[in-house]
């Protein structure tokens, strides 16, 4: 076959005419200095605040400080491998994380990368980490209960779906335990949970994950972990990543979600470290001036959405660690003013054997009472004030004065109430059983039971109710109120008599 030269020429001319080279213009800067998770970059003149940038070794960062001659970049990842003189290019988008049902049961870092060794994530969608909180028109007032399974909280400091309830207390008072119990208690209720571990030891996070797996709670939970060994920017961004993952289920699937931030004190410390390294002016306790906004923009994302917007909700349980019970420090007062109430745990109550060590006097739920079920409202209505009176009487009795029979009876009942409110870790109680226990103690049925045997009697009472009177429990569970009070009183009275006869 002979090739004609004029044909070759015409084909070549046509190809040359159609040839277009895609020129990609990238704005590239240079690292001037780097250290402690922060880099100062020269040359990115058009970079926008909050925009992602990429270093030549693939590590990403975010433009944080826009200055006259340089840009302060926070580095998400291993900053040790970044050197002076490295090139940095703009990515042209903001920070996003993967979202969707594929994340359930997985352990991720704040960048949305899996760290549990169970294979790739295969998430189909992403959402921006910094997203605005829902507006007033999108919200609905809190009216559905978010049961924690903890008697002291569900009875006296009730939490509703869409609420922000702070858990505050010294180190080792059981703050994380309350949050984990609440997650375990959501089993079978269609609530998606996100647990954000900020600045914790890897071993602590591992044992928490194991506990959730044991209780069958991991299948509806996403774990976001920024360990203590991670650089400050990772600890700073972790809560926002967790909130974004929950927002997907709230907005796009109309589901109820629960997010635990454990704990925001460490996030504030990480943010302070970043701000000081970026040479931002320090304020009170060396925190930057916008540390309030750091937490308010995070916690305002929790809401109960109106039915027009799917009716989903995000309940936030932020945790704050205090030093020596100092609730009036900067970060605790900030978060108390942002949230809809707080559960205050006291170390001396914890040491005295009251667990959970909830200080009912200081603890409050500003919007939760609207979400409490009728049955609980009825039986526990005066419980908080009764306990406050009991504490006053207890202090008075310690003076050694002789007490009249009425005061003594009030004291004795107070001790029995405290026994009922004690609860072991990782064993949340269904709300219908809580109602029975509190009804029995507040109506005086346990006054004849010795204080030392109150918890034994409670176990016997609930076991008998489950086996012989399941219809009463079912009625409370479904109707959410005690309809046949006289019948319930009669039942409990006979169970008390049976217990005393058995133990004498």
UniProtKB/Swiss-Prot annotation:
**GO MF, any single term:** ADP binding
Under the heading Pfam families, the entry gives: ATP-synt_ab, ATP-synt_ab_C, ATP-synt_ab_N
Q: Which EC class, in a word?
A: translocase
- Its membrane topology, per UniProt? Peripheral membrane protein
Q: Where are the transmembrane segments?
A: none
Which annotated residues bind ATP? 169-176
Per UniProt, subcellular location reads as: Cell inner membrane
| Site feature location: Required for activity | 363
The EC number of this protein is 7.1.2.2
Q: Which reaction does it catalyse?
A: ATP + H2O + 4 H(+)(in) = ADP + phosphate + 5 H(+)(out)
Chief place of localization: membrane
The record's PANTHER family line, in alphabetical order, gives: ATP SYNTHASE SUBUNIT ALPHA, MITOCHONDRIAL
Assembly and binders: F-type ATPases have 2 components, CF(1) - the catalytic core - and CF(0) - the membrane proton channel. CF(1) has five subunits: alpha(3), beta(3), gamma(1), delta(1), epsilon(1). CF(0) has three main subunits: a(1), b(2) and c(9-12). The alpha and beta chains form an alternating ring which encloses part of the gamma chain. CF(1) is attached to CF(0) by a central stalk formed by the gamma and epsilon chains, while a peripheral stalk is formed by the delta and b chains.
Question: What is the official name of this protein in its record?
Answer: ATP synthase subunit alpha
Q: Which organism is it from?
A: Leptospira biflexa serovar Patoc (strain Patoc 1 / ATCC 23582 / Paris)
GN (gene name) = atpA
